[in-house]
Amino acid sequence: MTINFYDELRRLLEQIPPGRVTTPRLLAEALGDSRAVRAVLEALKREEFQWARGLVDAGAENPYGDFESSKPLESLRRLQMELSSRVVEFDDFERAELIGGADVAYRGDVAYAVCVVLDADLRPIESSEAVVEVSFPYIPGYLAFREAPAVEEAVRGVSALDVLMVNGHGLAHPRRCGLATHVGVELNLPTIGIAARRLVGREGEPRDGWTPLIHRDRVVGAVLKRNGRGVYVSVGHRVSLQTAVELALRTLRDRLPEPVRWAHRLAGELKRGSKGFYAPP
């Protein structure tokens, strides 16, 4: 499930009476989340909204805010909570020999997704790709609704994998449903979230090779540090945190585990039209 963010925004803008203006915040709240303010501002720069730019003023006095809206972002949050309730946080797979990595690159409104599968020696043996037009911008906490359709299409294209590492968070998310969890539950695959930036939480006391990531008094992930830089690992679905950490450490050669590093590289090459299996530096 996702929404066409731009269609929803257009419906709101068309409700503004002649002679009235609104604010970006009121539009974001009508969409269902004030954190969408930046996405609203970016959307208004698009050519399709040129007609509406004079209708929005952040400093407007007595702005119009009596919108009729289903608040679609609230529906997406409810879906995240439902998906989160279905997460399995123990190892529900037989082996972890074929490890997949998934990532997405963008050019404008087009997503270039790649799923690559590595063997036990961390050599890429198969990849699948998907090119999908997106109609949902980046909004903090809602990344899956932008990226999951393309990622899931790419993942469905590979013949076999045991565990999938996704470039995005799993349970280390405000609603315990980052991209890795979203994809894992929807495809019923063992998934691990791998991210270069923290979304929630604080670091706890270091353990054996990793540091717990704590959010709301719960360990939601782990921080692995290499050369002073951290990578954030979390359960996506059907994997325990301990196993997620072990697999991340086993495949870590640079900052990112190899499956994600390969996926990131190949997604960029797909976007540029030059994808191929050649050894990364």
For every predicted segment, state its role.
Residues 6, 10-13, 149-183, 187-189:
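Catalytic-site beta-strand/loop segments enriched in glycine and acidic/polar residues
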Residues 50-51, 180-202:
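Short, acidic/small-residue loops that bind anionic groups at enzyme active sites
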Residues 56, 100-102, 165, 192:
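Hydrophobic/aromatic beta-strand patches that form the interior of the parallel beta-sheet core
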Residues 97-107:
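Two-metal-ion RNase H-like nuclease active-site motif
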